[in-house]
């Protein structure tokens, strides 16, 4: 079985991939678009991508690619607590440049401003790439923001642990495939994810669409708009619903009512949610 994921090794996505797929073939790709396209082109059986961070919000590239260009289905979700660390070759060295992925830098913005106000921030494709860059340039006064996994991989010192600005920082990862898949991990619940496109000629369309879930007591954990890429002011709505034994019977009727209102519904996935240890 082949699994595509957002690499390189040492990234948070690779931590999830190696935890969930202990004995499968793992293939790292350079971008989210490449990961999803690898699945769509039949190069792998599953694709693993980040979908949302609790601090920085939705990973727009993932949801947009899935909605606009892919027929992939969400078959599982993994939630990984994110622990960012400052890594360098030595704890005693001077730090003039700090490298990392934009989201990692955003998650540690306050810490870096307070402790390294003169350091210049440099962007890399991933946290792991930042750690690798530091490893390969021992003569430069540089550091990386990355996880402890990357520190071990590239033999770097952890200058400071848990430097993220907000406690409880976590990232959701979606596993894309054809059929629902279960894992020997801590299961915390079930979800249904939808993409709704509202009709132009229905006054109060969004309110009416949401109401089909509200009056049935179906819990909605997320709603967010994204551009339809048609014209300004046109959106689709990404919605996550709590799925359980009670809601499992109600959701099909809610979807039927949405269709009756003229709302286009795409089922992105019906899947289990798993909680992983700290990354």
From Swiss-Prot:
Catalyses which reaction(s): prephenate + H(+) = 3-phenylpyruvate + CO2 + H2O
GO biological process, one term: L-phenylalanine biosynthetic process
Cellular component GO terms held in the UniProt record: cytoplasm
Source domain of life: Bacteria
Domain (ACT) ranges: 194-270
InterPro entries: ACT-like_dom_sf, ACT_dom, Preph_deHydtase, Preph_deHydtase_CS
Gene3D superfamilies listed in its UniProt record: 3.30.70.260, Periplasmic binding protein-like II (3.40.190.10)
SUPFAM superfamilies: ACT-like, Periplasmic binding protein-like II
Site label Essential for activity, positions: 171
Residues in Prephenate dehydratase domain copies: 2-178
UniProt GO molecular function: prephenate dehydratase activity
Pathway in which the depicted protein is active: Amino-acid biosynthesis; L-phenylalanine biosynthesis; phenylpyruvate from prephenate: step 1/1
Keywords of the record: Amino-acid biosynthesis, Aromatic amino acid biosynthesis, Lyase, Phenylalanine biosynthesis
This protein's name: Prephenate dehydratase
């Amino acid at each position: 079985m082949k699994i595509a994921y957002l690499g390189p090794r040492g990234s948070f996505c690779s931590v999830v991939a190696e935890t969930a797929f202990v004995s499968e073939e793992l293939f790292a790709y350079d971008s989210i678009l490449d990961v999803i396209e690898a699945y769509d082109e039949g190069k792998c059986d599953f694709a693993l991508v980040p979908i949302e961070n609790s601090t920085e919000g939705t990973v727009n590239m993932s949801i947009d690619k899935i909605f606009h260009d892919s027929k992939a289905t969400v078959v599982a979700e993994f939630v990984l607590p994110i622990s960012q660390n400052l890594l360098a070759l030595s704890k005693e060295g001077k730090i003039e440049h700090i490298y990392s992925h934009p989201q990692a830098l955003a998650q540690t913005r306050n810490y870096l401003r307070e402790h390294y106000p003169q350091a210049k921030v440099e962007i890399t494709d991933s946290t792991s790439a930042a750690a690798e860059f530091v490893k390969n340039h021992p003569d430069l006064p540089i550091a990386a923001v990355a996880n402890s996994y990357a520190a071990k991989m590239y033999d770097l010192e952890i200058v400071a642990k848990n430097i993220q600005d907000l406690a409880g920082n976590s990232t959701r990862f979606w596993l894309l495939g054809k059929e629902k898949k279960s894992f020997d991990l801590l299961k915390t619940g079930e979800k249904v994810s939808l993409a709704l496109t509202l009709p132009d000629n229905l006054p109060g369309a969004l309110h009416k669409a949401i109401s089909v879930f509200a009056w049935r007591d179906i819990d909605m954990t997320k709603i967010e708009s994204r551009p339809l890429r048609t014209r300004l002011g046109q959106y689709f709505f990404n919605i996550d619903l709590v799925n359980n034994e009670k809601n499992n019977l109600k959701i099909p009727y809610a979807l039927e009512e949405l269709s009756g209102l003229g709302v286009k519904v795409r089922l992105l996935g019906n899947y289990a949610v798993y909680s992983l240890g700290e990354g």
